[in-house]
């Protein structure tokens, strides 16, 4: 299944989770997200199959993760984050933690414990002026990289897919 956040750009009246069939790309199910918690849309979402949730946040200075039921897509709860995380662009579960990429001043990557909400900055990317930090995926590769993060260049005519090693404490 493919899970996606859909927005009515710059209006945010119909912020939606949609589930697509990966073979046909047809929408199979959708639900409106919590407008109370998805202030200025839903710039990203992440599936946590182990705990049965889909996570998202508001765009600016997110005070909490917003958890939706993986099967029904209904709002379940919020999880307070220990420090606001600004402009999250994408995230993925790796082990029991959520890693998120931002488009904040340093395009930082953060680790968030989804059970406690404890957030810590892993590293800054410090991209060229005008670049935009985008999404991230987690996948162990033979060269030791774990986090793979996308960024767009200042003129949006080039994209970089950067690979980072990161040791997760047990």
Task: Please annotate each region the language model reported.
Residues 36-48, 84-93, 129-140:
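Repeated scaffold domains used in trafficking and secretory/extracellular systems
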Residues 10-19, 62-67, 106-112, 155-170:
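Structural motif
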Residues 26-36, 74-81, 118-126:
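A short beta-strand motif characteristic of beta-propeller blades
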Residues 1-41:
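Hydrophobic alpha-helical segments and helix pairs
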Residues 7-9, 57-61, 103-105, 141, ...:
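Short loop/turn segments immediately following the C-termini of beta-strands
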Residues 1, 50-52, 95-97, 143-145:
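Short coil/turn segments that connect the beta-strands within blades of beta-propeller domains
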Residues 21-25, 69-73, 113-117:
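Short loop/turn segments that connect beta-strands within beta-propeller blades
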Residues 83-114:
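Loop/turn-rich, solvent-exposed surfaces of beta-rich toroidal or solenoidal domains
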């Amino acid at each position: 299944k493919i899970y996606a956040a859909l927005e009515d750009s710059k209006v945010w009246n119909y912020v939606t989770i949609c589930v697509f069939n990966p073979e046909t790309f047809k929408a199979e199910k959708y639900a409106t997200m919590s407008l109370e918690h998805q202030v200025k849309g839903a710039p990203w979402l992440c599936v946590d199959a182990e705990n049965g949730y889909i996570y998202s946040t508001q765009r600016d200075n997110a005070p909490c993760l917003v958890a939706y039921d993986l099967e029904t897509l209904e709002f379940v709860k919020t999880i307070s984050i220990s420090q606001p995380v600004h402009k999250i662009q994408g995230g993925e579960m790796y082990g029991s933690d959520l890693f998120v990429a931002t488009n904040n001043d340093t395009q930082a990557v953060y680790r968030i414990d989804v059970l406690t909400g404890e957030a810590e900055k892993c590293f800054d990317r410090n991209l060229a002026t005008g670049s935009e930090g985008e999404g991230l995926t987690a996948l162990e590769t033979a060269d030791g990289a774990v986090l793979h993060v996308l960024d767009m260049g200042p003129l949006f005519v080039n994209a970089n897919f950067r690979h980072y090693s990161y040791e997760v404490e047990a």
